[in-house]
Amino acid sequence: MLPSTLQALTKKVLATQLISEDDYYTLKCCGLWWHEAPLMLCYDKNHQMLVKTPILKEGLLLNTALMKAVQENNYELIMLFTEWGANINYGLLSVNMEHTRNLCRKLGAKEGLEASEILQFFFKTKRHKTSSNIILCHELFSNNLLLQNVDMEELKMIIYWDLKDLTDNIILDDNTSLSEMLTKYWYGIAVRYKLKEAIQYFYQEYEQLNEWRLNCALSFNNVFDLHEIHNTGKVYMDIDEMMRLACIRDNNFLTIYYCFALGADINQAMFTSILNYNVFNMFFCMDLGANAIEESKALAEQKNYHLIVNMLSFKNYSPDPFLISKIIDPKKINTMLKSYYSKNMSTFDYMCIGYF
């Protein structure tokens, strides 16, 4: 959408230019100043406008920036972002003063939002996976009373699909408050997408959620965060329980290896992988030395996992000597497994070719 006035267009052009400190006074006079720093515009790979400052260095989508400006009762930026094309109705999600609500009305906002609109705005806002945006989403939504008006089952479904690989998705429990559910949700998103600044923010603000962070790191194969939170000594979990959590999601080679290097039982890891029909994990466990083949085969038979039974019927599996050094440096683990293909899966592939 084009800016509604020549002045707004001029400001938009100015905000996209490379600037020096000599230009700061001009930017202040033009209202291109936010959080005691210059306000800049750029576009992401999807051609969406992003508002940036040195604090919001990853940028916010224009509608999200509007919500932040409304929360701060920053009239100048509310009007500017609206002229640049922001949907003023987004501001109704964060308005906290009546005179700011009146300004939003003057700029075209509705009297109130329907429950479906609240959920739609929530869905669109959370899609931008950066530290700046996830932290702001937490600030805007986790204690937002408007979210109590939405269809809670729909909200939980959104959360479920974003965190569906979490091993124990306890945040969807009916006994969990909306605020706690959303706080854990944003924390989980930060760990899943390796948003370092957001992870550190939640770690400092919510020390009581350290076990949740560990759970997320194991579930989402984030070996770097797993190493960091495990080494703090602020959360304890049995190593075999850690391995169990890592094995519930397939292809979690990084966190499975890390738990293996710490001494977790690799045969139990193989059993967990089979119970969850995670074939890639199963072969990786054999690469790491799991040798309870007959027990695993019996378990697969109990579950009627016929393909796994057939896989375990071959006898030529053996550990991969390349993997048994038990290193715990996450960088080295990541390098070692970056393009790893299971030795035993290759063996199975070869035997299948010969068999058929």
From Swiss-Prot:
ANK repeat start-end pairs: 61-93
UniProt keyword annotation of Repressor present: no
What keywords is this UniProt entry annotated with?
ANK repeat, Early protein
Q: Name one GO biological process term.
A: taxis
Coiled-coil boundaries? none
> Which family is annotated?
Belongs to the asfivirus MGF 360 family.
* Protein name, per record: Protein MGF 360-19R
State the organism of origin: African swine fever virus (isolate Pig/Kenya/KEN-50/1950) (ASFV)
